[in-house]
Design a protein with these regions (language model features):
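Histidine-acidic metal/acid-base catalytic patches
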Residues: 1-25, 40, 45, 51-56, ...
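Short, basic/glycine-rich phosphate-binding loops at helix/coil junctions
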Residues: 74-75, 140-146, 244-249
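Short hydrophobic interaction/assembly module
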Residues: 51-75
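A short beta-strand-loop structural module common to alpha/beta enzyme folds
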Residues: 30-39
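Active-site loop/turn elements of alpha/beta-hydrolase fold enzymes
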Residues: 36, 62, 114-115, 185, ...
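Short acidic/His/Gly/Ser-rich catalytic and metal-binding motifs that mark active-site loops
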Residues: 66-73, 119-122, 252
Length: 304
């Protein structure tokens, strides 16, 4: 089953019903994910469309709606991994609100970002080196290895904070019959890494959570030599509940329409469970025609 995320058009609409009708009318999607750029002002129109039976929702991407003090899409504005307990508490309460909206709109999933380790950024510097023709140069490898050592040394306390927050969020989601998708992240600094995620799922030990695979993020990590995309997906596929579908132009230009970049969808998609939810997450810069062509190719290869 395929759905479409409002991250493509929420920024250019002031009315939620018009935003949803653009996706339905121009792209033909009946099933929609409310992305992390949904302002509170869009909610009345969204609720109106839902109440009229004109739209169904696959999922909500935390935080949805945006906290009132945040003006633009910002899924990492509050983090479960934060040093200060006040920020962690704010992240939890905002996530509860997202879960409440998901329950109200009969959306079965909420997609979560979990936070990051406080360390010198490494992902973007590696991307810049790759773009400058220095991929896997001595400088590149030295920077990468140093970052891995620091991440492994310092990450545990941040991951523990995430676990403490997640337990509360899982309990709340269970009370609302909403499932949580823990998304793989673009940046090596972010939580969880692919090494951390299986044990995180094991420790939480809840049917309420599963893995949410972002094709673009995983491809960026493969392009930067952090993982093998197919090997990772093959290992985690049985625990995957949904995914964000997008392509990626080397090394890190993601949110492209499928079949426009270097993601080997023909090899990767069949690895996923038959009941996996596929949510298209497109850049606002992609045109309707580009997306339509991609949808047609997808349906020819993988069906509806």
């Amino acid at each position: 089953m395929i759905a479409f995320s409002t991250c493509w058009n929420s920024g250019r609409h002031n009315a939620g019903d018009k935003m949803l009708r653009e996706i339905k009318g121009k792209l033909g999607f009946e099933l929609i994910e409310l992305g992390h750029g949904i302002r509170i002002s869009l909610m009345p129109g969204i609720q109106k469309m839902f109440d009229a039976g004109e739209v169904r929702f696959s999922s909500l991407h935390n935080f949805c709606p945006l906290p009132v003090e945040v003006m633009a899409a910002s899924p990492d504005c509050y983090q479960f991994s934060a040093v200060y307990p006040q920020e962690r508490e704010r992240a939890i309460k905002q996530t509860f609100q997202t879960i409440d909206f998901a329950a109200r709109l009969s959306a079965p999933f909420v997609v979560l970002h979990l936070g990051a380790v406080n360390m010198k950024p490494i992902t973007d510097p590696l991307i810049e080196l790759a773009k400058a023709g220095k991929y896997l140069s001595r400088k590149y490898v030295r920077l990468k290895l140093s970052a891995v050592q620091k991440r492994e040394k310092n990450g545990a306390i941040y991951v523990q904070r995430v676990k403490d927050c997640l337990r509360r969020v899982i309990d709340y989601a269970a009370s609302k019959n909403v499932k949580l998708g823990l998304e793989n992240r673009r940046g090596y600094e972010e939580i969880p890494t692919e090494r951390e995620l299986p044990s995180l799922l094991d420790e939480m030990n809840s049917p309420q959570i599963g893995y949410w695979h972002d094709f673009g993020h995983a491809q960026i990590k493969e392009n930067l030599a952090f993982l093998d995309h197919a090997e990772w997906l093959r290992a985690i596929a049985p625990r995957t509940v949904g995914c964000h579908v997008q392509d990626c132009i080397w090394p890190a230009q993601d949110h492209q329409p499928p079949f426009a970049g270097g993601v080997d969808l023909e090899k990767l998609v069949p690895l996923l469970p038959s009941n996996c939810l596929f949510v298209w997450e497109m850049s606002p810069r992609k045109t309707t025609d580009e997306i339509r062509r991609s949808i047609q190719l997808w349906k020819e290869r993988f069906g509806e």
